[in-house]
Amino acid sequence: MHSMISSVDVKSEVPVGLEPISPLDLRTDLRMMMPVVDPVVREKQLQQELLLIQQQQQIQKQLLIAEFQKQHENLTRQHQAQLQEHIKELLAIKQQQELLEKEQKLEQQRQEQEVERHRREQQLPPLRGKDRGRERAVASTEVKQKLQEFLLSKSATKDTPTNGKNHSVSRHPKLWYTAAHHTSLDQSSPPLSGTSPSYKYTLPGAQDAKDDFPLRKTASEPNLKVRSRLKQKVAERRSSPLLRRKDGNVVTSFKKRMFEVTESSVSSSSPGSGPSSPNNGPTGSVTENETSVLPPTPHAEQMVSQQRILIHEDSMNLLSLYTSPSLPNITLGLPAVPSQLNASNSLKEKQKCETQTLRQGVPLPGQYGGSIPASSSHPHVTLEGKPPNSSHQALLQHLLLKEQMRQQKLLVAGGVPLHPQSPLATKERISPGIRGTHKLPRHRPLNRTQSAPLPQSTLAQLVIQQQHQQFLEKQKQYQQQIHMNKLLSKSIEQLKQPGSHLEEAEEELQGDQAMQEDRAPSSGNSTRSDSSACVDDTLGQVGAVKVKEEPVDSDEDAQIQEMESGEQAAFMQQPFLEPTHTRALSVRQAPLAAVGMDGLEKHRLVSRTHSSPAASVLPHPAMDRPLQPGSATGIAYDPLMLKHQCVCGNSTTHPEHAGRIQSIWSRLQETGLLNKCERIQGRKASLEEIQLVHSEHHSLLYGTNPLDGQKLDPRILLGDDSQKFFSSLPCGGLGVDSDTIWNELHSSGAARMAVGCVIELASKVASGELKNGFAVVRPPGHHAEESTAMGFCFFNSVAITAKYLRDQLNISKILIVDLDVHHGNGTQQAFYADPSILYISLHRYDEGNFFPGSGAPNEVGTGLGEGYNINIAWTGGLDPPMGDVEYLEAFRTIVKPVAKEFDPDMVLVSAGFDALEGHTPPLGGYKVTAKCFGHLTKQLMTLADGRVVLALEGGHDLTAICDASEACVNALLGNELEPLAEDILHQSPNMNAVISLQKIIEIQSMSLKFS
């Protein structure tokens, strides 16, 4: 027991944490027994590690690049900041230098002024102390010559015997001084143009020349120049009709004439010196207008001294009678009435006696209103080319023509419609309103300022008598014309009724005409000839110049005028029909020849000056088509469309420029095609017509200029404030986009004119007045949508015209063929659901990658309009480009069969010529020839009885579009076209075209409804 315990104790002494040390195993056989790694796996591991390393390197590289860029940007910003600071420093230095230079210049100017002032101060004392006996100035050679001439004339005057009766006005020194005194530079002095001041002249009695020498001073040449400049300024200021006279009095023509005669006889100096220099010779000079001469008469001084009485008593009356005493040949655009100079033998004798009396210097009885005694004189009035003994007759003729001018002025101002009556002879026949307007005006109406003599009372009475007789004749002729108008208007009304009898109308017309000719009095030869000519030409020349009339005061006169205007309205509008309109209505108007209306075409007196179409009494031909359609081809064009251009004026950056239509118009003129066509006067389309397709906001925005826009509601004009209408272009102009430029003043008018030209031309073709037509218009329109302007287009001319024809002229079915290389997205949008209009477009599509991106083959319409929208969308780009073969194949397989099935009443063609060869790829890039366009037009003329209207759309190569326009107009005229090449006729279209056509046929075969 004890031994067991001791053994346990021994075992417990061994350390528990120590392990027995085993020997190192150095055998290699155990390693060979371990599993071997597959080399493929090892390769993959290595590749993964390599990729990981590469990724780490890329990340490190990107980090380095980013760090480099960041540092580079920081350095760049620092460099820019340093440059800005350096520039600021340079600018500051430059400004300081400029300020220093300015200060130096100012200092230099001050020094120069100071030196000049000192120099003048040094020169003044010698001048102030100069002896008065010495000369103060040296006279110029001109002044010396004038002085010598004056002294010679003075000595000649002394040599001639002088008495109280032989003093002429031109040689009286005191009178010369009086006339010269009025050339002072006072504000009330008259200008050099011949108008006289309103104050009166006081002429002192005759004095000896030794006591009153007329020379006031001897002016040197610089003084003359200064005076002439000041006089010219005063003359320019006083000659303005807008400035009132400070004197306050009305200057009569008679007073002006009397002073002008006096002044012209005493002074004829140069314009530079005025009347301050003496006369050139002993005789007076002719006045500015060369209408009168004042010879030295025994009573010249008496005549001048009595001038004040004449002016005071008769100036106002004469002013009210004859407001313009000159230019009898001006007729204000109306034919002058022949003067009556051969009234009777007694009148001739009276004129002869008066002429003899005038030659002797004795005034006629009552010549100056009865205020001049018999001893006064009257200057001889000589006209150019007239002897002195015929002065009275020439003056009489002059006054008669002046009275006619006054009557014509009343006619233009709103008097009697055709033959106004003279207020001199028949004051009781003028309405109170008219009589009130012809009282003495406070401000004289503007007219030519002349110095012809005013008529005298005896001559005025003669004028009154002759004008009264002439007025009676004209009044009878006017009444006859009104009666003939009534009869002819009745005959026209009978023609419109089915049971009208032309023979009865003719007999009634002839009977009334004979009765009026019997009642017409026969007075003078000229009056009778005028009367007969007026009656004979009444039927052929129906119509007269309609002048705006002033409203009459009395109700009775207003009713009479209203009745007469109503009776004449139907008849007066007939001459305004254009020749093409009358030709189209030849079937309806053939019976009018029986009553004298066959001269309607021959006598076209007055053409309309408005841009709107002329109104007609007969029914509109579009409502009831004539039996035979017109045979003419119309051309619509207006120069207003040339003004639509960018303000930069560079046509190279803007392909849609004014040279397009200008070149086409010139080509048509050069080839003579324009002479074979009917020129159609264009007009601006109304906003209501534009709103047939476009929204009200769009039509107001692009259809009005800034002047018109001020009158519109700004809320309608601006619309959505968030919408941006115009933007600045790189060239400096404005535009809707980078291509569609906008001119604030002219673009709206040009766009409306383009629409109006197409409407006018299509209306005349639809009504039968024209066979077909071509509208040479710009800007184009087939890209313009309801509220969007794009692609050079603002208003869709063809779409608006189509709706106008359908709504206004009842054209039920219209075919629109778009030949432009770009798709007409605006036209498609306007008629996408409309079954009355078939739209066919041939355009480059390229799967939507060509502008405007629309026009896919599967866009066939919607609703009732499904199948009435056909897009011949070419694909495949320009490898190869489409040409004549492809377009002819499209017409043969799709356009012609579908159009014949549709059977349109009218064909509108969007004639875009940018598919022609010569256009760059961005603008088209196709290779269609101009000859092909002519043949395509000829094929379209087989539809709708030939009623085809082409409207220019795109096309920017000038030579190409001119050739195509010439070919199309030749086709419209029916001329022989240049044949296409044989290889084109027998060639097959390219594969891209075949694929496109097959796809279109497949799609349309399922959607066409009218087949």
Curated annotation (Swiss-Prot):
Catalytic residues identified in the record: H783
Gene from which the chain derives: HDAC9
Region (Interaction with MEF2) location: 136-154
Region span, Interaction with MAPK10: 175-343
General function of this protein: Responsible for the deacetylation of lysine residues on the N-terminal part of the core histones (H2A, H2B, H3 and H4). Histone deacetylation gives a tag for epigenetic repression and plays an important role in transcriptional regulation, cell cycle progression and developmental events. Represses MEF2-dependent transcription.
Name the record gives this protein: Histone deacetylase 9
Biased composition (Low complexity): 262-285
Segments of this protein annotated with the region Interaction with CTBP1: 23-27
Gene Ontology BP annotations: B cell activation; B cell differentiation; cellular response to insulin stimulus; cholesterol homeostasis; epigenetic regulation of gene expression; heart development; inflammatory response; negative regulation of cytokine production
Molecular function GO labels: DNA-binding transcription factor binding; histone deacetylase activity; histone deacetylase binding; histone H3K14 deacetylase activity, hydrolytic mechanism; histone H3K9 deacetylase activity, hydrolytic mechanism; histone H4K16 deacetylase activity, hydrolytic mechanism; metal ion binding; protein kinase C binding
Primary enzyme class: hydrolase
Sequence segments annotated as region (Histone deacetylase): 631-978
